[in-house]
């Protein structure tokens, strides 16, 4: 059975019945209803019953810590400024992103990986498209190959989430169960390995956050939080309050982004959220973002005629919030390399 249970007001949706070919239609519909309601009301939910092995999740944190344990010179070897054109991948040091005037830059540091696109691809170097950057000190089979395997698992998971979300749209809209499939054609799928260092009490500042109040820019976000950590909060307008999002064992946090909100005419809500600083604990997480097909002209499914080009929207939001790094997205895209 699909379940929608209240966990500090953030629902938990178990999708195991939807993935089970032997489940009844009623059980599958329960999952659809639960996820649709969670995304309509909260824009966030905890995901259980996803079928991804526990060892895969533990390995993701191992890879996260492997990268951030590198010396600074090794991390800077793959600085995001060294990515080709506007492909926007690699290492972001702390203090890069500022979401609102009057706040200090986020303390997070990030290693970002996207869909692997070869140098001779005609789109190479355009926004969010190109080869990934890998630190030379980490063996390919121990780091790169395992990261790309995890990315593949996330892509399969988001396909299932989109299938459920499509069936949860209002029936009167007449949408096909495959209405979101066009998002998956050569998708932009940035994946961020995140580290938040502790902020000692003597350095605390009310303007400082791990990540300040923001919404995600794309369609669907899948966040893996490390057990034993805290800090993620979601803004809930009816009570004008911030709701903590607890870590559930072997689960994910799923949220809708701005692009999904625009695509569904506001039916699926992109909720504001933030990450607080911690005085003592390091926080590690892994976030997978489905931006979608960057060239897709996404016309609002509610018939409101609003149309958004996926890549233009997300690129614009990054330029607005990423400071000097955002200027990388205004570089001229290089001509594709012709390989022998």
Swiss-Prot record:
Textual note on the cofactor: Binds 1 Fe(2+) ion per subunit.
Enzyme class, spelled out: oxidoreductase
Record Gene3D superfamilies: B-lactam Antibiotic, Isopenicillin N Synthase, Chain
Pathway: Secondary metabolite biosynthesis; terpenoid biosynthesis
Domain of life: Eukaryota
Binding site for Fe cation: 214, 216, 273
Binding site for 2-oxoglutarate: 283
InterPro entries tied to this protein: DIOX_N, IPNS-like_FE2OG_OXY, IPNS-like_sf, Iron_ascorbate_oxido_reductase, Oxoglu/Fe-dep_dioxygenase_dom
Keyword terms: Dioxygenase, Iron, Metal-binding, Oxidoreductase
Gene Ontology biological process terms from the UniProt entry: small molecule biosynthetic process; terpenoid biosynthetic process
GO molecular function terms attached to this record: dioxygenase activity; metal ion binding
Cofactor(s) essential for the protein: Fe(2+)
Application of this enzyme or protein: Xenovulene A is a natural product exhibiting little structural resemblance with classical benzodiazepines yet is able to displace high-affinity ligand binding to the benzodiazepine site of the gamma-aminobutyrate A (GABAA) receptor and could be potentially used as an anti-depressant with reduced addictive properties.
Any one Pfam family match given in the protein's UniProt record, by short name: 2OG-FeII_Oxy
Induction of expression: Expression is significantly up-regulated under xenovulene A producing condition.
EC number in record: 1.14.-.-
Residue ranges of domain Fe2OG dioxygenase in the record: 187-292
Entries under PANTHER family matching the protein: 2-OXOGLUTARATE (2OG) AND FE(II)-DEPENDENT OXYGENASE SUPERFAMILY PROTEIN-RELATED
Function field: 2-oxoglutarate-dependent dioxygenase; part of the gene cluster that mediates the biosynthesis of xenovulene A, an unusual meroterpenoid that has potent inhibitory effects on the human gamma-aminobutyrate A (GABAA) benzodiazepine receptor. The first step of xenovulene A biosynthesis is the biosynthesis of 3-methylorcinaldehyde performed by the non-reducing polyketide synthase aspks1. The salicylate hydroxylase asL1 then catalyzes the oxidative dearomatization of 3-methylorcinaldehyde to yield a dearomatized hydroxycyclohexadione.
Similarity-based family: Belongs to the iron/ascorbate-dependent oxidoreductase family.
Name of protein: 2-oxoglutarate-dependent dioxygenase asL3
Organism: Sarocladium schorii
Higher taxonomy: Eukaryota, Fungi, Dikarya, Ascomycota, Pezizomycotina
């Amino acid at each position: 059975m699909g379940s929608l249970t209240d966990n500090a007001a953030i629902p938990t949706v178990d999708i195991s019945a939807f993935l089970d070919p032997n489940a009844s239609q009623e059980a599958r519909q329960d999952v659809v209803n639960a996820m649709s309601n969670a995304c309509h009301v909260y824009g966030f939910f905890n995901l259980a019953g996803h079928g991804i092995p526990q060892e895969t999740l533990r390995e993701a944190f191992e890879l996260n810590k492997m990268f951030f344990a590198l010396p600074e010179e090794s991390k800077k070897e793959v600085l995001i400024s060294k990515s080709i054109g506007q492909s926007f991948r690699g290492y972001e040091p702390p203090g890069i992103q500022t979401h609102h005037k009057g706040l200090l830059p986020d303390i997070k540091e990030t290693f970002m990986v996207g869909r692997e696109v070869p140098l001779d691809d005609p789109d190479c170097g355009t926004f969010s498209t190109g080869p990934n950057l890998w630190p030379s000190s980490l063996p390919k089979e121990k780091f790169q190959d395992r990261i790309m395997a995890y990315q593949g698992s996330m892509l399969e998971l988001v396909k299932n989430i989109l299938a459920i979300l499509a069936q949860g749209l209002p029936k009167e809209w007449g949408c096909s169960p495959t209405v979101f499939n066009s998002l998956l054609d050569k998708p932009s799928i940035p994946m961020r390995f995140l580290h938040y260092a502790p902020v000692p009490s003597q350095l605390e500042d009310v303007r400082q956050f791990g990540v300040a109040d923001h919404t995600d820019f794309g369609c669907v976000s899948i966040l893996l939080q490390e057990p034993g950590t805290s800090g993620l909060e979601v803004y809930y307008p009816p009570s004008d309050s911030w709701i903590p999002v607890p870590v559930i064992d072997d689960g994910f946090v799923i949220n809708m982004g701005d692009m999904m909100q625009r695509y569904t005419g506001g039916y699926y809500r992109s909720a504001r959220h933030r990450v607080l600083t911690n005085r003592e604990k390091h926080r590690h997480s892994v976030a997978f973002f489905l931006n979608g097909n960057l060239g897709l002209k996404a016309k609002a499914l509610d018939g409101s005629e609003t149309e958004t080009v996926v890549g233009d929207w997300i690129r614009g939001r990054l330029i607005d919030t990423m400071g000097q790094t955002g200027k990388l997205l205004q570089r001229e895209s290089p001509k594709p390399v012709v390989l022998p």
